[in-house]
Amino acid sequence: MKLSISRRIVRWPALAALVACAAIVVPNVNGQTTQTVTVTSTVPGVLSLGIDTNAVSIPFLAGDYSPSTGLATKVVAGANTLAVTSNKSWTVNLKANTAAFSFVPSAGDPDPAKPAGNFSYKVSTAGAYTAITTSNVVVKTGSKGGTATAGNTFIMDYQLTSNLAQDPPGTYTLAIIYTLTAP
């Protein structure tokens, strides 16, 4: 019996030595290493003004004029739709390019220098019309976002007055300028 006990005692130290050697020789498979990656992106300033048409006609007919005063007023509701895309808060300004309409006479009349202020505008959802000037006037302000952002798409109404005593027959043209800024 002593023989079998001594064999067991000899086997355990040999097994312990074998495990110790394996720990030294076998690499640690449970190790871990990390690396950090920095992602960089540059976002440009986005500022875009779209308009549905660059030409609006406001023709007067003989029946538009008051027989007693000779005055006429024409309104074009929904004359222009403007759409803003911006990643900053924005402002749209409006002004006339010149102080008077250009004039091409129908019958050789002299240029009456029809004032630009005979043309008025308003945002469709606003109250009264405002006579245009040659100075930038704030028409609308809005929030950053696309054209689907509330308030970033809006409609403009136009109004033009005429007076038989001052406006000879012909074609009157006025350039109006919308300017989008992001302060």
Task: Label every PLM stretch briefly.
Residues 17-19, 29:
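Cleavable N-terminal signal peptides
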Residues 2-16:
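Bacterial N-terminal signal peptides that target proteins for export
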Residues 27-114, 137-183:
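N-terminal small/polar-rich segments of proteins
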